[in-house]
């Protein structure tokens, strides 16, 4: 793992077989919930996550915008979203009642309190995958500009050496 002022890059080494990369927007270091995800391409996602309620200040809430890229196309990908608990007739027919629902064929935007994206890979022994993340407190476009400006044309090792 390495970073620049407004970006991060992680390198993961996997065994042979099925491997996965997850971006969990339902968990965080603060108590605030709410996120939005959009699949831009097979290897790029963008969105926003609300952060806040930090240091006992419930009004200190702010968005963090991001662009995430992976360096290899996954064999499959999708979203997950925690479903609200239901009662009565609704609960009887919904197998995902109060649980996490996987969206394996849905490729449009998704929003919610407990969402994420998964990418599945068939990897070889010691295969390395890299994940780049640009962030901004201003906009998704600024997050993309930060990623392009601080990592474009650089390898993981070059960023790590800086």
Provide a role label for each language-model segment.
Residues 1-162:
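Beta-sandwich/jelly-roll carbohydrate-recognition scaffolds of carbohydrate-active enzymes
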């Amino acid at each position: 793992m390495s970073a620049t002022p407004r970006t991060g890059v992680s390198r993961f080494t996997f065994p042979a077989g099925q491997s996965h990369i997850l971006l969990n927007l339902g968990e965080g270091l603060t108590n605030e919930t709410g996120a939005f995800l959009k699949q831009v391409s097979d290897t790029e996602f963008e969105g926003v996550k609300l952060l806040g309620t930090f240091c006992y200040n419930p009004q200190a809430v702010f968005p963090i915008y991001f662009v995430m890229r992976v360096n290899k196309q996954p064999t499959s990908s999708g979203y997950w979203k925690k479903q609200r608990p239901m009662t009565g007739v609704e609960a009887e027919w919904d197998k995902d009642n109060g649980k996490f629902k996987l969206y394996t064929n849905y490729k449009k935007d998704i929003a919610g309190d407990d969402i994420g994206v998964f990418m599945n890979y068939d990897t070889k022994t010691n295969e390395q995958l890299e994940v780049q993340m640009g962030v901004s407190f201003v906009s998704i476009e600024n997050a993309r500009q930060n990623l392009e400006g601080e990592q474009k044309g650089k390898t993981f090792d070059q960023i790590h050496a800086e």
